[in-house]
Amino acid sequence: ILSLLSIRVSDIIRLYADLTGGDQGLAHKILADLGISEDFLKSKKLHELSAGQTKAVCTAIALSTRAKHILLDEPFEQLDPARKNKLIRYLTEYDGIIILNTHETWLIKNLIHWKTFFMFEGSLYGPILVEELLNAKFSFQEEAKALMKLVISGKTISLISEGHGKPILSLESLDKIYELALEAEKS
């Protein structure tokens, strides 16, 4: 494993393609779209990349394996908005099941046909279709007609489609829900 750290990124991409029967060309196409050239990858080792470049390389490798299922951990982290939009296109075109986690709520409007789960404090809630979430709001009280009820910091928060609440898409990050729950508790 230590010897893998000393090889060039382009060789790591080739290795994964060989091991998985993946498409090395697709990995390079995705990375080129994200502004990372093949020549650059031939000149760098993985530890020499920025956090965003490393995230892009790992995501491109995963997508290029064409596996039936892939798991992406925060694939948008450290990417600028333009690169995030390009990556979304590859995710929506992927012919397989993608499980990804993110805190960024603005992304969901681009993943309209996806199922969504929420995880707060180790508890998993869902599924709920993204199209149901687009106009949904967080209500900081128990609502009888809630789409979903979440328990966050010991408080029940309802996800509602009608009524007063904080629109999900108005939150930059789902982490903000903790701050809002605390504010609601004080009022």
Language model feature labels by segment:
Residues 1-52:
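ABC-family P-loop ATPase nucleotide-binding domains
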Residues 123-150, 164-168:
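Conserved beta-strand-loop-alpha-helix hinge in the C-terminal portion
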Residues 76-77:
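Short loop immediately C-terminal to the Walker-B catalytic DE motif
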Residues 90-103:
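Conserved catalytic loops of ABC-family nucleotide-binding domains
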Residues 63-68:
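A short, proline-enriched helix->beta-strand linker immediately N-terminal to the Walker B motif
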Residues 104-111:
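Conserved H-loop
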Residues 144-187:
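C-terminal coupling/interaction segments
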Residues 59:
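Hydrophobic anchor residue at the start of the ABC signature
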